[in-house]
């Protein structure tokens, strides 16, 4: 008879354990999805920077000049075709540039507002001095 009294307690522990495992799995999945989107946006910024580098205006090695209007167009085109990041056609884009005194670009922050979701990535522009 004593063993029957312990069954509800054991069942309650099993249900609580399943609930905690479910919550942990959901958190991990959401965290992974957010990290994947951030990485996708960052890699898109990086690819757009490299393809829009203005190599003809390099003054010192290690500094990079980009054509900002071409970069923004290229970024929008690339991010819309990116499979990791699903952006609607009504999304708005905001770009912030951190420039050196001579006009070369140090870093770029791309912010995408898509409905109630906001994605952002910051990329430090660095190239090997050669």
UniProtKB/Swiss-Prot annotation:
Gene Ontology CC annotations of this record: membrane
Main localization category: membrane
Topology with respect to the bilayer: Single-pass membrane protein
Key words, A-Z: Membrane, Plasmid, Transmembrane, Transmembrane helix
Transmembrane feature ranges: 8-28
Highest taxon above the source species: Bacteria
Localization, UniProt: Membrane
Protein name in UniProt: Uncharacterized protein pXO2-26/BXB0024/GBAA_pXO2_0024
Organism: Bacillus anthracis
